[in-house]
């Protein structure tokens, strides 16, 4: 019975996925993922990216956000990206495969950053969801806390932090924490984000010294 339910659920997800207009547009344009459109909407409203910036992209694979960001920062910009999963190369992106919760991977990531002044830290990280909020939300909050910690370590004063967060227990506290660190904080729900999804995007600009 459980197997049948899981199969039906998977079938519904696949049907929804491939009928999604943003998935179809991404395929037509040769984009890595529909996440490209989410970041485009954020850029249109918040003007995060500028030519020449250095960016850290966490949870980067398959590369939708990095693929978008390189079009905004140009040849003089640089992206340091990290993910557990492999990612096909993108010109202008220095990709590190590994779990940045691992001390050696984190060290390698920070070495890539070096003395660069990072203007944007962005995270589209999400755990493998089991469908139970009591399990999924704490896992997701753990990842966004790590992303915020990374922004504390490498983000230059005045820099920006963009992070995907799933609404639920701990969200309000996390938002308060970000507001204490940045001068302007917005919560965005892009049109390209599925309406039934708990995901929202916190866009924080003007990191306080």
Swiss-Prot record:
Which class of enzymes does this protein belong to?
A: transferase
The entry marks the following residues as binding S-adenosyl-L-methionine, namely: 63, 65, 83, 99, 124
Primary subcellular site in the record, as a coarse category? cytoplasm
Record flagged with keyword Transport: no
Q: Which GO terms describe its molecular function?
A: rRNA (uridine-2'-O-)-methyltransferase activity
Question: What InterPro entries does this protein's entry cite?
Answer: RNA_methyltr_RlmE (IPR050082), RNA_MeTrfase_FtsJ_dom (IPR002877), rRNA-MeTfrase_E (IPR015507), rRNA_MeTrfase_gammaproteobac (IPR004512), SAM-dependent_MTases_sf (IPR029063)
UniProtKB keywords: Cytoplasm, Methyltransferase, rRNA processing, S-adenosyl-L-methionine, Transferase
Is ATP-binding one of the keywords?
no
Q: Which residues form the active site?
A: 164
Catalysed transformations (reactions)? uridine(2552) in 23S rRNA + S-adenosyl-L-methionine = 2'-O-methyluridine(2552) in 23S rRNA + S-adenosyl-L-homocysteine + H(+)
Q: The organism sits in which domain of life?
A: Bacteria
This enzyme's EC code(s):
2.1.1.166
Where it sits in the cell: the answer is: Cytoplasm
Q: Which Pfam families match?
A: FtsJ
Return the GO cellular component terms, semicolon-separated.
cytoplasm
- What is this protein's function per UniProt? Specifically methylates the uridine in position 2552 of 23S rRNA at the 2'-O position of the ribose in the fully assembled 50S ribosomal subunit.
User: What's the protein here called?
Assistant: Ribosomal RNA large subunit methyltransferase E
The organism encoding this protein is: Klebsiella pneumoniae (strain 342)
Q: What is the lineage of its organism?
A: Bacteria, Pseudomonadati, Pseudomonadota, Gammaproteobacteria, Enterobacterales
